[in-house]
Amino acid sequence: LVLATFGRSFYILDDYSALSNLSSNLASKATIFEMKKSLMYMDARPLGLRGKGSQGESHYTAKNPPLGAVITYFFNDTLKTSKDLRRKAEKKLIKKGEDVVYPTLNQLRAEDRQEKPYLIFTIYDNDGNEIRKMVEKPSLGVNRIVWDFRMTPQSNIKLKTSQPGRYGEANAGPLALPGTYYVSLHKVVDGLATLMVDKTPFECEWLEELSLPAESKEALLAFQQKVDRLRKATDAAGEVLSEDKKRLQFIEAAIKSYPALDIKLIEKVKQLDKMRDDISISMYGDPSLSRRDLEQNESIASKVGIVIWNMWRNRSEPTQTNNMLYDNASSEFEKVISQMTKLDAEIKGLEKYLEEKEVPFTPGRGLIMNWSKE
């Protein structure tokens, strides 16, 4: 459908089938319209990177629509916060010339604490397993959200996400298999999730125009999921190592500043810190060499990252190199787990010593639970 206006605007609607069924769904709070078959493929990047690549601002490009299964839905619920409802009521009173009562402190406190409502779209595979959740801001009328055919990435949970850099990729999971999928819609208000639309089926199909297609799509996905589980473990290890460094720093500060603590334990802390640094070098490489541009072997995280870089935009068989990188990273990480377990036990031993000496709080210790009124 092509539309043009006298204001020089020009619109092209690639799929307006939802509008044909809109009238019968106006009375419902929410509806997910029937979806046409979604074609799964990897977007081409002829300029080497996303968009205009390195061509400069003089090279004009326009963004393509997002790649994925397009979910068109109708939402007819206001989902206003208490503050929004109060202000709306106050405007009516002002318009009538009536007095506006100032809200109570409890009302204001409740408004300050109230989270804005949101929608959760859940994607299920044909067996009913949840494979992805997408959070969306509620908006009245006909809207669209796109599932990028990706499963949930197994990297660390983050409160905020940022746009990938020029040479980076957005955090993503492996590409799902073709087949039947389902999507449901929940609204969440004040922490209470309410089902608005139950599982709605849709079909996804691979475009098979590949030079070197994988013999088994299932085996390819199994390898990618295996790699993603390794990423899950290595990412978690990185966070634990960061916490261990913080714990050791505070333990050392306590020994140096608090009375009646054995200062000879500083040497013990330094030994554990060196142990932590050695583990970090295995995980992420040697920063002393990196700062001086000196060559070094690939770290565990680097090997995992290379496999993901090679395989996440690829539908061919894993290469011998990718299999070798996974095997090497897995074997090395098994040793790291053993070392980190020993390190954690040693740090807990020092923290127990601080507990016995009634030292004030340091990260990793629940000192507040030991207090009682005197």
Question: What role is predicted for each listed range?
Answer:
Residues 1-59, 66-67, 76-78:
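Beta-propeller blade termini and top-face loops
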Residues 9, 153-157, 186-198:
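Short acidic/polar inter-strand loop motif in beta-rich domains
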Residues 18-46, 194-232:
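Low-complexity, Pro/Ser/Thr- and charge-rich linker/hinge segments at domain boundaries
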Residues 45-118, 144-146, 220-231:
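Contiguous beta-strand segments within globular domains
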Residues 121, 163, 178-188:
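Short, aromatic- and glycine-rich surface loops/edge beta-strands on solvent-exposed regions
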Residues 130-177:
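Glycine-centered tight-turn motifs at strand-turn-strand junctions
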Residues 187, 200-202, 233-374:
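Mature extracytoplasmic or organellar-lumen-exposed domains after removal of signal/transit peptides
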